[in-house]
């Protein structure tokens, strides 16, 4: 039904995650420098009226791009290290409010419409980790959608003493062979140079769900397109 309601951050795991947090924090300073220094070089050369060759300009642009991706990846890894370890105190939260908040934080493109059926249910957990969970799952759907517009459907129901949530989109979907791998940190189905994504979002989602004693998985869907992600969370007041 569910695993014990515990934190993943214990013993050696806690030490490893503290190291990850410190390491990513320090590396982010280097990544920001890598993003800024090419601009300084360009400004200095412009002040001296030096015109860069096309190849040199492309190389500087490439350096900025890779530095930006590195910074995004380090930010995502920092968020992963914070789950459970730096969590807010557990409390009861209105599921509809959590989902609506995540929907408002989605990027403007693609334009996704959120349909919610939360049934007035409440869940128990740290607010910051629950926000990370819904941002990760809904954000993953937006990041990989292949159209300018689409739909997200979030349905919740009671399940024993817990609340089961299913998030479905109408994007391109994922082949069943990859349904497990996508929850691993830094996992992407295409090269990061093509997608621009860190591959950490669903790893964050899995860590939050497991820290709250649940499980998360991709489930089969009868729709011709799309993906459905299902997970369970501790209910509040008997799940309602």
Sequence positions of predicted segments:
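Detector for a conserved hydrophobic position within an alpha-helical segment of the HATPase_c
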Residues: 209-210
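Conserved glycine-rich
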Residues: 214-215
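Short conserved segment of the HATPase_c
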Residues: 174-186
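Acidic ATP/Mg2+-coordinating residue in the GHKL
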Residues: 169
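Short beta-strand/loop element within the Bergerat-fold HATPase_c
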Residues: 151-161
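Conserved DHp (HisKA) dimerization/phosphotransfer helix of two-component histidine kinases, i.e.
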Residues: 54-108
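Short helix-loop "hinge" at the ATP-lid/N-box region of the Bergerat-fold HATPase_c
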Residues: 140-145
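Short alpha-helical Gxxx[C/S/T] motif in the catalytic ATP-binding
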Residues: 201-205
